[in-house]
Structures are given as structure tokens and as C-alpha cells.
């Protein structure tokens, strides 16, 4: 009998915290498959912990060991090995709320039994801030109908802080394979591609107003730490260019809500890239900013380019006296309010 869901857990030197993540996933029982992808860990006991869980729970846990390929290759490896109807990535320093997980899986079981399983299941996620012990939830009650099947026609407007992220989605595994997505190796921030590229293949969705995913944030070495993002801005640019290239948004003109959301997502990616290039502040970074907008212009249609220029992404590319100071200041205020990194 097919598993209801495959959880992929990319692990790289994660021994200090991965057990907590795995234990929350085990609460799903035999409905779930847990794929622990050891991404060439060498500094701690991560490989042994993966093998330990696979031996202890042979009908649930798979241990996959690969040469280091980065987070994206861990996700790719999970998709290659997944046998579940649905696929969800859970980073090894994050976890799922077990009560919410049981409710989500029960609902999915019911929908599958009725023959109405959605292509995409969406839930809330919670930022867990280690530095001050606070948390805040990103929910979508103003965007999606609750507790029923819907399509793109019924999707509302997203606020800038409301993007769908890897934390909030469960895709049907078939959709991920159908779209042909292969995440780039040795690149951070590929979770944006994971959410974005399959969207045109999604015909049905379901939203549950449950705080399922717990996103641990605040480690000094974390990829979303501001100083780390400035150092890795070239990887952010690589992901943004991949997203520019992976879908033809003009082909979606008859799906206005889907196209509008994908333009919104692309504009956010352009804005993030701009801001971290401004934070870098070097002449080289300024040139990369110019090149990124030129890349967008050359690799999309005039209508897509114009739409992004007139959005939040365009605001971060304005030029006026002290514009860089104003834009970075706006980012600092937003960061303080929304606490997104």
C-alpha cells in the first residue's frame, strides 16, 4: 500500500538537533515515509544517526548517504527516493507540530478516499526565534478559502510577508516529477525554486489554518542570517535567475491569479537580491545589481519586465538622492516588524 506522505530531511552535520526533527515526524506512524538524506556529513555523528533510525524503524525510515551536494541535492535525492503520494521537506533543525500533523494527515486520508486529493496542501508555519524566545505565525486566512478544495480563481491577494514557502506546502509527488524540477547543487535558497517552479502544474489546492511547521531561526551560521546572506548573495542571484528562466509567465495569461502570484514572487526575489547587494555596498555589487535587471529584461517579455519594475522589486531599484539609504532603512524596519531573518 502506498504511503500517504514522504518526508525528506536533508542533513548536514546535524547531529546536535536532528533527533528532535525526526521524532516529530515519527508521530505520523506507518502513513509516512521518512527519507534522511546525509549530505556528506563528516564533522559529527549525522551518518550514524541516520542509520540508527533506519534500523530502528525499517518500515518508515530510509537512510540515504550521498556526496556533499548541498541542500538542493538533498531535496532532489528525496524526490528520487520518495514513494509517498505527497512530499514535504523538513529541514533538520526545524520540526512539525505533532497535533497539527495528525489533523493534516487525517484530512488528506479523507480526501484521498473521496478521490479529491489536492495537488497542493497548504498550512501555516511559525517562526521560532531562538535569540529572544518569541514566535510568530504566517497564516493565509486572507488568501485562501479554508477547509475546502479550490483552484487559482479563488486565490486572494498576498501581502509582502505572505509568500508560500517550502515550510507551508506539501506537493503531490507526481506534480514535482511532472514539472521536471531539478534544484541546483551547492546552492542555498533553492527552497524558492521548490515552491515556485511546480505552481503551473497545480490545478487543485486545500488550505488548513493549522500551525504545522516550526521554523527555527537565529543560529549564527544559518543561511538566512543577514551577514551570511550578504556573503552568499551570488547564490541568491543564481536562484533568482533560475526562477526567471524556469517558467514562461506569458504562457499563463489565461490564468490571471496564478500569473499574478508568480509575478509577485518573482518581484520579491528581485527585491531581496537588490537589498543584499545594497548591503554589500561595493562597486562590484552595484554592477551585479545592474546586470540582474538587465538579465530580467533580456530573458522575459516586456510585459513581465514592466510588471516587476512596477512592483516591490522595482521600488528597490529606484534611483534618487540617498535612495540606497532609504531602501536599506525600509528593509531594516520591515525586518524588525516581521522578524524574517
Across the structure, where does each feature detected by a protein language model lie?
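Donor-binding/catalytic cores of nucleotide-activated saccharide
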Residues: 71, 94-205, 213, 217-229
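N-proximal low-complexity "stem/linker" segments adjacent to membrane-targeting elements
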Residues: 1-24
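Glycine-rich, basic loop-to-helix element that forms the pyrophosphate-binding segment
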Residues: 66-82
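A conserved acidic beta->alpha catalytic loop
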Residues: 24, 38-48
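Short, acidic, metal-binding catalytic loop of nucleotide-sugar glycosyltransferases
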Residues: 23-32
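Short beta-strand/loop segment that forms part of the nucleotide-sugar
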Residues: 31-41, 62-67, 91-92
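Short aromatic/hydrophobic "clamp" motif used to bind/position activated sugar donors
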Residues: 87
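Membrane-interface aromatic/basic loop that binds lipid-linked glycans or pyrophosphate carriers
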Residues: 278-341
Amino acid at each position: 500500500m502506498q504511503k500517504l506522505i514522504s518526508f525528506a530531511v536533508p542533513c548536514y552535520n546535524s547531529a546536535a538537533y536532528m533527533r528532535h526533527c525526526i521524532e516529530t515526524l515519527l508521530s505520523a506512524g506507518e502513513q509516512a515515509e521518512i527519507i534522511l538524506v546525509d549530505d556528506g556529513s563528516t564533522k559529527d555523528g549525522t551518518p550514524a544517526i541516520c542509520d540508527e533510525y533506519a534500523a530502528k524503524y525499517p518500515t518508515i525510515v530510509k537512510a540515504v548517504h550521498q556526496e556533499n551536494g548541498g541542500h538542493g541535492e538533498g531535496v532532489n535525492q528525496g524526490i528520487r527516493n520518495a514513494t509517498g503520494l505527497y512530499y514535504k521537506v523538513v529541514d533538520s533543525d526545524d520540526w512539525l507540530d505533532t497535533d497539527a500533523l495528525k489533523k493534516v494527515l487525517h484530512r488528506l486520508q479523507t480526501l484521498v478516499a473521496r478521490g479529491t486529493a489536492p495537488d497542493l496542501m497548504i498550512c501555516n508555519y511559525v517562526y521560532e526565534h531562538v535569540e529572544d524566545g518569541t514566535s510568530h505565525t504566517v497564516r493565509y486566512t486572507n488568501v485562501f478559502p479554508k477547509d475546502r478544495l479550490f483552484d487559482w480563481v479563488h486565490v486572494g491577494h498576498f501581502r509582502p510577508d505572505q509568500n508560500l514557502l517550502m515550510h507551508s506546502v506539501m506537493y503531490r509527488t507526481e506534480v514535482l516529477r511532472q514539472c521536471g524540477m531539478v534544484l541546483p547543487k551547492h546552492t542555498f535558497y533553492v527552497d524558492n525554486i521548490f515552491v515556485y517552479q511546480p505552481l503551473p502544474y497545480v490545478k487543485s489546492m486545500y488550505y488548513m489554518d493549522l500551525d504545522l511547521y516550526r521554523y527555527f531561526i537565529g543560529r549564527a551560521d544559518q543561511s538566512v542570517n543577514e551577514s551570511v546572506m550578504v556573503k552568499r548573495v551570488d547564490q541568491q542571484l543564481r536562484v533568482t535567475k533560475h526562477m526567471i528562466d524556469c517558467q514562461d509567465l506569458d504562457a499563463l495569461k489565461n490564468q490571471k491569479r496564478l500569473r499574478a502570484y508568480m509575478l509577485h514572487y518573482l518581484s520579491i526575489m528581485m527585491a531581496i537580491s537588490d537589498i543584499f547587494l545594497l548591503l554589500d555596498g561595493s562597486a562590484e555589487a552595484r554592477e551585479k545589481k545592474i546586470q540582474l535587471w538587465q538579465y530580467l529584461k533580456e530573458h522575459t517579455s516586456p510585459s513581465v519586465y514592466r510588471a516587476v519594475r512596477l512592483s516591490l522589486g522595482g521600488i528597490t531599484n529606484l534611483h534618487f538622492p540617498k535612495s540606497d539609504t532609504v531602501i536599506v532603512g525600509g528593509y531594516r524596519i520591515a525586518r524588525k516588524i516581521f522578524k524574517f531573518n
